[in-house]
């Protein structure tokens, strides 16, 4: 049996920027073990698997390590795959996932993800994570992810992590996002996951489920532009809605191949 694997860069219109995700269309679900092995073989942060139903798509996400409950950039990549490679003409792509119903709108090459809002609350950081940070945060919040607040974009860009200490903690599907006001945008961030194959994520849609409501309350605005200042980097168009958030960005297909199982 062969499967088709699309490599798609999300939150970028350049193959050297954004966050690469693999997208695998299926007729029926493979076993979780098979999908995890495919994700390991793909060697990118996330692989999305989808099945077309009558008027929606079932969607699951795997890192090389575990199945995730939500992945924004791989959802955006999947929407792009469906529109560009499966002649899908509806303006709204509907997904069903472990995080419930997710809708993506496609307008003029920009994909807007409708995602659940995760308002972070004040918290304390595990000591190993705190000690692993080269620059200490001024405050700590938590939702699914730990959200660390800093004073400047320079601090976010200069931050380094002692992985020996950082990897002493397992956050399951969660991670650590560091954030500050941006110099030429509303806010910036970076995202790290302990004990993961990839320490830093290039662009993370799901972390903005927490970042958007936080910065909306700080900046007193509901429409914002964010940059994830990883090595590859990416731009996100952010909207804070009443109960959910919207994250928008571009995508491009880099390659496609067949994989034998």
Please describe what each predicted stretch is.
Residues 1-70, 76-261:
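Active-site proximal loop and beta-alpha junction motif in alpha/beta enzyme cores
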């Amino acid at each position: 049996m062969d499967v088709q694997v699309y490599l798609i860069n999300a939150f970028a219109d350049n193959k050297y920027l954004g966050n690469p995700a693999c997208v695998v269309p299926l007729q029926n679900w493979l076993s979780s073990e098979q999908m995890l092995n495919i994700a390991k073989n793909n060697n990118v942060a996330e692989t999305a698997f989808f099945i077309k139903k009558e008027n929606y798509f079932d969607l699951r996400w795997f890192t090389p390590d575990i199945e995730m409950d939500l992945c924004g950039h791989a959802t955006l990549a999947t929407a792009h795959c469906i529109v560009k490679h499966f002649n899908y003409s509806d303006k709204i792509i509907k997904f069903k996932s472990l995080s419930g119903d997710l809708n993506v709108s496609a307008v003029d090459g920009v994909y807007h993800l409708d995602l659940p809002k995760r308002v972070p609350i004040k918290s304390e950081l595990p000591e190993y994570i705190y000690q692993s940070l080269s620059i200490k945060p001024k405050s700590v919040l938590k939702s699914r992810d730990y959200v660390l607040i800093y004073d400047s974009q320079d601090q976010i860009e200069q931050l380094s992590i002692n992985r020996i200490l950082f990897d002493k903690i397992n956050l399951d599907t969660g991670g650590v996002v560091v954030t500050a006001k941006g110099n030429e945008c509303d806010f910036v961030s970076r995202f790290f996951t302990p004990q993961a194959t990839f320490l830093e994520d290039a662009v993370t849609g799901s972390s903005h489920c927490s970042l958007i409501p936080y910065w909306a309350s700080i900046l007193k605005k509901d429409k914002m532009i964010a940059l994830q200042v990883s090595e590859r980097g990416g731009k996100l168009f952010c909207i804070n809605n009443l109960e959910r958030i919207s994250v928008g960005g571009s995508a491009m297909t880099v390659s496609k191949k067949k994989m034998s199982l």
